[in-house]
Amino acid sequence: MLLQHPPTAAEAPRFVQLSLQQDLLGGWLLVRETGHIGQRSTVKREQYLKQDEAMAAFEKARDANLRRGFQVMFAQGSEAPR
């Protein structure tokens, strides 16, 4: 899921990309990539043993970013929040 914050006069637009990935041992990774468009980004990975825990963390991160003014630009495999 790609989220983008509208640009301001002082800075370039920011983005957050969230994804869930299964690792080789059956665990799950929540991958968060954040940064300003056109600049270097930061990637953080959080590991979970169960898919339900990873999905809950994904939804929590998504909701937190939506509250901060980010907008969904692209989502695959799930319905965008209303």
Task: List where the protein language model places each region.
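Short aromatic-glycine-(Arg/Gly/Cys) micro-motifs in beta-strand/loop hairpins
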Residues: 17-44, 59-60
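Charged, amphipathic alpha-helical segments
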Residues: 11-17
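Negatively charged, low-complexity tracts enriched in Asp/Glu with abundant Ser/Thr
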Residues: 1-11, 51
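A short, charged, amphipathic alpha-helix used as a generic interaction element across diverse proteins
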Residues: 40-42, 49-70
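A generic structural signal for ordered alpha-helices
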Residues: 8, 32, 36-39, 48, ...
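Short, mixed-charge low-complexity intrinsically disordered segments
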Residues: 64-82
